[in-house]
A protein has these predicted regions:
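Ribonuclease/tRNase effector modules and their secretory precursors
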Residues: 1-135
Length: 135
C-alpha cells in the first residue's frame, strides 16, 4: 500500500508550542494509514472525527500531554454538531520537529470520540498543556 498524504490545514504554532517549542512547520497532514486506523479501531467515531478534524486542530478546546510519546499532543474539541451534547473529538497529533526542508509535516495519528465524563477524568489526571480561553 502506497502512503497517500492529504494536506489538512495549518496549525497555530503559538497554540501548539505548548507541546514543544521546536515546531518546524505549521502544515498538518492526514495519511491514508491513519484514516484506515481510525476506521478499523474507532468505527463508531469515524464520520464525526473526519468531519471535525480540521476544526479540532485549528481551534482546540484543550491540549493534553501524551505522556508516552515525545512531541505528541492529545487535542480535544467539543462536537457542536452531535446529537449527544457531551461528545468531544479526541485527536492524537504528532508534531514535526524536523520537516527536512518541507518534506515532512505534523501528522494526525488517530482520532475518536470521548464523553464529557472521560474528558473530566483526563483533565483531572493528565497534564493539561493548553485550555482555550472563554470569549
Amino acid at each position: 500500500m502506497d502512503l497517500e498524504v492529504k494536506e489538512l490545514c495549518a496549525l497555530d504554532i503559538n497554540i501548539y508550542k505548548c507541546i514543544t517549542e521546536n515546531i518546524d512547520t505549521d502544515r498538518v497532514v492526514l495519511t491514508n494509514k491513519s484514516v484506515i486506523h481510525i476506521a478499523d479501531h474507532h468505527p463508531d467515531a469515524y464520520n464525526d472525527v473526519l468531519i471535525e478534524l480540521k476544526d479540532t486542530i485549528t481551534s482546540p478546546d484543550f491540549i493534553i500531554s501524551d505522556g508516552k510519546h515525545e512531541n505528541t499532543g492529545l487535542i480535544i474539541k467539543k462536537i457542536e454538531s452531535s446529537e449527544k451534547t457531551d461528545q468531544h473529538t479526541f485527536i492524537v497529533l504528532k508534531i514535526c520537529t524536523n520537516s527536512q526542508n518541507g518534506q515532512l509535516a505534523n501528522s494526525i495519528i488517530s482520532g475518536w470520540k470521548i464523553s464529557d465524563k472521560r474528558l473530566q477524568s483526563y483533565l483531572r489526571n493528565k497534564q493539561v498543556l493548553y485550555k482555550k480561553e472563554k470569549s
